[in-house]
Amino acid sequence: MATYEQVKDVPNHPDVYLIDVRRKEELQQTGFIPASINIPLDELDKALNLDGSAFKNKYGRSKPEKQSPIIFTCRSGNRVLEAEKIAKSQGYSNVVIYKGSWNEWAQKEGL
C-alpha cells in the first residue's frame, strides 16, 4: 500500500505510474494529484490491453511494462481495489494502491 508521502514523491520518480481511476467528471470537480494519469476504472482493462503507441496517444504517456511500479488512486480508496485486481489479472506485478486516495491527498494538501 502506498502512503501519502510516497505519492507526493512520485514526480521525482518518472518510472512510477500514478493512475487515477476516477471518472473525468470527478477530476473536473475536484482536481487531481500531480503526475497522475487518468484512466477511468471502466476503461482500465481495455487500456492495459492497448498496444504501446495507442496507449501513449490516448493517455499521453508510454504504456507501463508488466514490472513497472504502478500506484492506483481514486476518491476514497474503494475503486483502487478493483483496479489492482484488473492490473494483476493482466500480469502487472508491481502494483499497489493508495488507500487514502484523493480524500486524504486533498486533506493533507489543504484543498
Curated annotation (Swiss-Prot):
Taxonomic source organism: Drosophila melanogaster (Fruit fly)
InterPro entries found in the cross-reference section: Rhodanese-like_dom, Rhodanese-like_dom_sf
Protein's UniProt keywords contain Iron: no
Taxonomic superkingdom: Eukaryota
Protein's name according to its UniProt entry: Rhodanese domain-containing protein CG4456
SUPFAM superfamilies the UniProt entry points to: Rhodanese/Cell cycle control phosphatase (SSF52821)
Alphabetical keyword list: Stress response
UniProt domain Rhodanese: residue ranges: 12-110
